[in-house]
A protein has these predicted regions:
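ADP-ribose/NAD+-binding catalytic cleft of ART/PARP-like enzymes
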Residues: 1-76, 162
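Low-complexity, intrinsically disordered/propeptide-like segments
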Residues: 27-30, 34-37, 116, 121, ...
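Short, surface-exposed beta-strand/loop "edge" segments at domain boundaries and coil↔beta transitions
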Residues: 48-59, 120-127, 145
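Amphipathic alpha-helical interaction segments
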Residues: 53, 60, 67, 93, ...
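Generic surface-pattern signal
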Residues: 61, 96, 100-103, 156, ...
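Low-complexity, flexible helical/coil segments
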Residues: 62, 78-83, 120-122, 149-158
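ADP-ribosyltransferase catalytic core
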Residues: 69-141
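Charged phosphate-binding loop/patch that engages nucleotide di/tri-phosphates or the phosphate backbone
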Residues: 136-162
Length: 162
């Protein structure tokens, strides 16, 4: 009965960026297999002191990228989801590697780590990769600014060797 309820609920819910997802689906893109998060703890990168910039998918923070990807036949629904991590350790390691490759990463994806809980009413997630990363597709009513809190500044680390 519980599985039936989840399927019924998922069919009734609309994703926050459903219009854009539908457009990509019409162009032949596909949604990945999605799962209920079941109140899992998660973390993601965020901007300290700029809540309005947090929890915005890549295609919405850079609409030109979406148009370019579509024009080049490289549209991807994943870029309408939020990148999340299953543990702070895996998120910090991922960020450290990004900082080594991209010196301005803090201004692109954030300077801090935010943590919160993802409920089944918030949306659906992809399978968690071995590096802890997964995509989270928010439902319309989801507002992670209310449930996620910044827990750590990531740019104060003194582990870079320039």
């Amino acid at each position: 009965m519980q599985a039936y309820e989840q399927i019924r609920m998922m069919k009734e819910e609309k994703f926050k960026y459903q219009k854009q997802i539908d457009m990509l689906l019409a162009l032949g893109c596909q949604l990945p297999e999605l799962f209920a998060p079941n109140d899992m703890n998660a973390c993601r990168f965020a901007f300290s002191g700029a809540d309005y910039q947090n929890h915005i998918p890549q295609y919405l923070s850079n609409p030109k990228r979406m148009l370019q990807d579509i024009n080049n036949g490289k549209g991807n629904t994943s870029l309408l989801a939020l990148s999340c991590f299953s543990t702070t350790e895996k998120a910090e390691l991922f960020y450290l590697n990004l900082r080594k490759a991209f010196k301005n990463i803090a201004s692109t994806i954030g300077d801090s780590l935010s943590e919160g809980k993802l409920s089944n009413e918030d949306g659906r997630k992809t399978k968690t990769a071995s590096n802890g990363h997964f995509d989270f597709y928010e439902y319309e009513a989801c507002d992670l600014n209310k449930t996620f809190q910044i827990t750590k500044n990531l740019i104060e680390k003194k582990d870079e060797k320039d």
